[in-house]
C-alpha cells in the first residue's frame, strides 16, 4: 500500500467532520477530513502541473504550518519525495541539501528567499522552481479547502522563468487522485520522504524512508490509550520525530492536532490549558525549561496524560521533576529513535517502572549490543555496548551514499546502551565519550548533575586534551539561569565532584556563556562547540603575555 492510501484508510469514520489539523494561534484555520482530502487531491494536481514526476524531490523549507501534512501528502501523492529542512538553515547547509537531493521544487518563506535564490543561481536552478509560502497563501489554501463550491479551472497560471511563484497557484488545477501502490515489493523500494540527520558531526545526511518503512514504523509504534487523544505539536514537523506524530494520526485515527510554529513556553502552556491537550512530545531542552519555569506550569498542564521525550539523553531526575508537574494519572516517558531507524524503544502510557530508561524494544525489531573493545555480542543484562538495529521501519539508504546498513540489514547507531529487566538505558554516544585516563565518560551524565542546580539553565560538556597530551578531561560550558545568583566556576566543579567519580571531575574547567549550539530539534551540537572551544584556545594563546 502507498502512504497516502494508508493515511485515508484508517479506522476513524470522521462522521462529525471535527477539525483535525488546527492552527494553535488561529484555531479558525483548521482542516477537517473532507477539506483535508480535497486539499491533498488539489495539491497532487498542483505538484504534477508544476513538473513533479515520480521520484522527484520537493524541498520544503518551512516552519510548522496547519497545511504542512497536506503538503507532504500532496508531494507524495504526486509521486514525489518530501524533504524537509529549516527555513533558518545557513547558506552552506542549504547549498548542501540542494546538491544532495536535486529538488524539482523548493518551498520556502520570505525570510529565506534571498538565500534560496542565491543557491539556485549558483546551481543553475531556475527561480521559477521556487514556491513562496506566506500567511496569505496559507489562508487561501485553508479557505479553498473549506469552500466546496469553489472549483477553479485547470488553467496554468502565467509563469515567468525568472520569477518565483506563490503557493496559492498550486490549487488552480482541479483535483487528481494520488499515486497508488498495491504491492509490497514496490512499496519497499519507492521513496516517500527524506529526513536530514542531525549533522552534529559534519554535514547532515538525508535518510530515505519508503512508503513501506513509514507504514511499518507507524503500525509498530501506534497503540490504544485509555484517554481521548488531542495532541499539540511544537517540535519541527520537518524533522523525523516531529513528522511522525503530526501527519498520520489526525487523518487516520481522528486525533486532533494543534500546530505551533515553534516552541515558546508561555504559548505552549496557554494552548495546553485552553484546548485540553492530552498528549505532546518534547525534547529534553524543553523539559528542562518546564522544570525551571516560574510560570504556573502545574496549573496549565492539568489536562495532559502523556508526554513523550526524545531527541537527546535525559536523566531520570529531570523526568521525575517534570512528572510532579502533571496530574496523578499522567506520565512522562522517554522514547528512543533515530532519523535512520525511527522510534524503536518506547515507554508507553502507564509503564513508569524505570523512569530513566528509553523503554522496551518494540515488536518486529531486532537489536544487538556489541562490546566496544572486541566487537563481540553482549548477551547478558547491565553490560553496556554499542547498539545495532534492524527491522522493517529502517531507512532504505542514505541519499547518494552506499554506507549505513550492512549486508545483514544491521544499522550501527553509535549509541551505547544496556538492558535491565527488558528496559533499555542509553549511556551516551561512542563519538562523544571522553577518554579520561582509560575510563570512558559520557558527557550527558555530567550535564544531568549540573542541571540539578537551579542556577544552571543549560550546559554542555565536551572533552579537551590536556596541554601535555596525557589524557582527555571534561570541560563544561554553562548558561546561567536568569533571576538566580550566578554560581562560580569552583561551585560548578564542586557539584560534579560531589556527585560523580573523581575521574569525571571538570578538570578541563568551567566556562560561562550566553547560549549553547543546538540543532533545530534541541540536540547538543558538540562538534560545533568543540570547534568554538578550539578557536577560543588559539585566541587565548595569541593574547597571552610572552
Curated annotation (Swiss-Prot):
Keywords: ATP-binding, Ligase, Nucleotide-binding. Transmembrane segments: none annotated. AMP binds at residues 194-205. It catalyses: nicotinate + ATP + CoA = nicotinyl-CoA + AMP + diphosphate. Its EC number is 6.2.1.-. Gene3D superfamilies: 3.30.300.30, N-terminal domain of ligase-like. Residues 445-523 are annotated as: AMP-binding. SUPFAM superfamilies: Acetyl-CoA synthetase-like (SSF56801). One of its GO terms (biological process) is terpenoid biosynthetic process. Disruption phenotype: Abolishes the production of 15-deoxyoxalicine B. One of its GO terms (molecular function) is ATP binding. InterPro entries: AMP-bd_C, AMP-bd_C_sf, AMP-dep_synth/lig_dom, ANL_N_sf. Pathway: Secondary metabolite biosynthesis; terpenoid biosynthesis. It is an enzyme of class 6 (ligase). The 15-deoxyoxalicine B cluster is a rare cluster that contains its own geranylgeranyl pyrophosphate synthase (olcC), in contrast to other related clusters which rely on a FPP/GGPP synthase localized outside of the cluster. Nicotinic acid-CoA ligase; part of the gene cluster that mediates the biosynthesis of 15-deoxyoxalicine B. The first step of the pathway is the synthesis of nicotinyl-CoA from nicotinic acid by the nicotinic acid-CoA ligase olcI. Nicotinyl-CoA is then a substrate of polyketide synthase olcA to produce 4-hydroxy-6-(3-pyridinyl)-2H-pyran-2-one (HPPO) which is further prenylated by the polyprenyl transferase olcH to yield geranylgeranyl-HPPO. Geranylgeranyl pyrophosphate is provided by the cluster-specific geranylgeranyl pyrophosphate synthase olcC. Belongs to the ATP-dependent AMP-binding enzyme family. This is Nicotinic acid-CoA ligase olcI. The gene is olcI.
Amino acid at each position: 500500500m502507498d502512504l497516502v492510501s494508508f493515511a485515508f484508510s484508517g479506522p476513524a469514520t470522521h462522521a462529525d467532520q471535527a477539525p483535525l489539523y488546527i492552527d494553535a494561534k488561529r484555531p479558525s484555520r483548521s482542516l477537517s477530513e473532507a477539506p483535508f482530502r480535497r486539499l491533498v487531491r488539489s495539491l497532487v494536481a498542483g505538484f504534477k502541473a508544476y513538473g513533479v514526476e515520480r521520484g522527484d524531490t520537493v524541498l520544503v523549507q518551512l516552519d510548522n504550518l496547519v497545511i504542512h501534512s497536506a503538503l507532504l501528502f500532496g508531494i507524495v501523492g504526486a509521486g514525489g519525495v518530501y524533504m524537509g529542512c529549516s527555513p533558518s538553515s545557513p547558506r552552506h547547509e542549504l547549498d548542501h541539501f540542494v546538491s544532495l537531493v536535486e529538488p524539482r521544487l523548493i518551498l520556502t518563506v520570505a525570510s529565506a528567499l534571498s538565500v534560496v535564490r542565491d543557491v539556485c543561481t549558483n546551481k543553475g536552478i531556475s527561480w521559477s522552481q521556487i514556491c513562496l509560502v506566506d500567511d496569505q497563501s496559507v489562508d487561501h489554501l485553508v479557505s479553498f479547502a473549506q469552500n466546496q463550491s469553489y472549483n477553479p479551472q485547470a488553467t496554468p497560471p502565467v509563469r515567468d522563468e525568472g520569477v518565483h511563484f506563490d503557493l496559492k497557484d498550486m490549487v488552480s488545477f482541479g483535483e487528481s487522485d494520488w499515486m497508488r501502490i498495491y504491492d509490497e515489493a514496490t512499496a519497499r523500494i519507492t521513496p516517500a520522504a527524506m529526513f536530514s540527520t542531525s549533522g552534529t558531526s559534519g554535514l547532515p545526511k538525508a535518510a530515505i524512508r519508503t512508503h513501506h518503512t513509514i507504514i511499518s514504523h507507524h503500525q509498530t509504534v501506534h497503540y490504544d490509550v485509555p484517554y481521548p487523544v488531542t495532541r499539540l505539536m511544537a517540535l519541527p514537523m520537518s524533522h523525523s520525530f516531529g513528522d511522525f506524530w503530526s501527519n498520520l494520526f489526525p487523518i487516520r485515527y481522528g486525533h486532533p492536532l494543534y500546530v505551533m510554529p515553534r516552541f515558546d513556553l508561555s504559548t505552549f502552556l496557554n494552548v495546553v490549558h485552553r484546548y485540553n491537550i492530552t498528549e505532546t512530545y518534547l525534547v529534553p531542552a524543553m523539559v528542562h525549561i518546564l522544570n525551571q519555569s516560574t510560570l504556573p506550569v502545574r496549573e496549565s498542564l492539568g489536562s495532559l496524560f502523556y508526554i513523550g521525550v526524545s531527541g537527546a539523553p535525559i536523566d531520570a531526575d529531570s523526568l521525575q521533576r517534570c512528572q510532579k508537574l502533571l496530574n496523578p494519572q499522567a506520565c512522562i516517558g522517554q522514547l528512543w529513535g533515530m532519523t535512520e531507524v525511527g522510534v524503536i524503544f518506547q515507554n508507553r502510557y502507564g509503564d513508569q517502572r524505570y523512569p530513566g530508561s528509553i523503554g522496551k524494544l518494540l515488536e518486529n525489531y531486532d537489536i544487538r549490543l556489541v562490546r566496544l573493545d572486541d566487537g563481540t555480542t553482549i548477551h547478558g543484562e547491565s553490560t553496556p555496548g554499542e547498539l545495532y538495529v534492524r527491522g522493517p521501519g529502517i531507512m532504505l539508504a542514505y541519499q547518494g551514499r552506499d554506507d549505513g546498513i550492512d549486508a545483514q540489514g544491521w544499522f550501527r547507531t553509535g549509541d551505547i546502551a544496556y538492558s535491565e529487566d527488558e528496559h533499555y538505558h542509553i549511556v551516551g554516544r561512542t563519538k562523544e565519550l571522553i577518554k579520561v585516563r582509560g575510563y570512558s565518560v559520557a558527557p550527558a551524565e555530567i550535564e544531568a548533575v549540573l542541571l540539578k542546580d537551579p542556577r544552571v539553565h543549560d550546559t554542555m560538556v565536551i572533552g579537551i586534551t590536556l596541554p601535555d597530551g596525557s589524557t582527555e578531561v571534561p570541560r563544561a560550558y554553562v548558561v546561567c539561569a536568569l533571576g538566580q545568583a550566578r554560581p562560580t566556576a569552583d561551585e560548578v566543579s564542586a557539584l560534579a565532584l560531589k556527585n560523580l567519580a573523581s575521574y569525571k571531575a571538570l578538570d578541563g574547567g568551567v566556562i560561562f556563556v550566553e547560549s549553547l549550539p543546538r540543532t533545530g530539534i534541541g540536540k547538543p551540537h558538540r562538534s560545533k562547540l568543540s570547534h568554538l572551544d578550539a578557536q577560543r584556545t588559539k585566541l587565548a594563546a595569541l593574547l597571552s603575555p610572552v
